[in-house]
Amino acid sequence: MDNLKEEETNEINYIIDQLQKLNKKFKIYTVQRFKEEEPFNKYISESVSKKTRLLIHGTRCSSVIPILQTGLKIRPSTSVHFSGKVYGEGNYFSEHVQKSLNYTGWDNDQILLIYEVHVGNEYIYEGWYNGDRGIKLNYNELLQNGYNSTYVKAGNGLQNSEIISYNEDQSKIKYIIHITK
């Protein structure tokens, strides 16, 4: 992790700080899926806004190997545990460790996947969160209006913000955080 850009260093340090405040024991591993590099770079090069962020994706341990083999899928196969799509079909991320830990299950080991996500021009949603009856955002409509992702702001019934990307080429894995109890 020595060759990080300053912004990426700040983001990973923020994640580490959150883990430490939760008194979590963890190890961070650097990961690179070469199959993600070219599509990710192409997606960014074709976008007006080049903005990316390091974001967290919580998943059960049983889903890690399939995700590493095939990448993070918007509609995963049945071999991967899949939960929620309150804001439409997409890959869901958070900037909050606690939010992402809620998706890791209750095993003694927990896994957080850290992705570089092209957020580009973000659609900011500040509406009321009403559980499974949430709004279904349409990626094609968002794209036609110049948006690349959705940032759902915390508040109005939602405790932590969420970021949704709608194209599998919008993200690439950078780190795996293994948490032990």
From Swiss-Prot:
<dbReference type="GO" id="GO:0006302">
    <property type="term" value="P:double-strand break repair"/>
</dbReference>
<dbReference type="GO" id="GO:0070212">
    <property type="term" value="P:protein poly-ADP-ribosylation"/>
</dbReference>
<protein>
    <recommendedName>
        <fullName>Putative poly [ADP-ribose] polymerase-like 100L</fullName>
        <ecNumber>2.4.2.30</ecNumber>
    </recommendedName>
</protein>
<keyword id="KW-0520">NAD</keyword>
<dbReference type="InterPro" id="IPR012317">
    <property type="entry name" value="Poly(ADP-ribose)pol_cat_dom"/>
</dbReference>
<dbReference type="InterPro" id="IPR050800">
    <property type="entry name" value="ARTD/PARP"/>
</dbReference>
<dbReference type="GO" id="GO:1990404">
    <property type="term" value="F:NAD+-protein mono-ADP-ribosyltransferase activity"/>
</dbReference>
<feature type="domain" description="PARP catalytic">
    <location>
        <begin position="1"/>
        <end position="181"/>
    </location>
</feature>
<keyword id="KW-0328">Glycosyltransferase</keyword>
<dbReference type="GO" id="GO:0003950">
    <property type="term" value="F:NAD+ poly-ADP-ribosyltransferase activity"/>
</dbReference>
<keyword id="KW-0808">Transferase</keyword>
<dbReference type="Pfam" id="PF00644">
    <property type="entry name" value="PARP"/>
</dbReference>
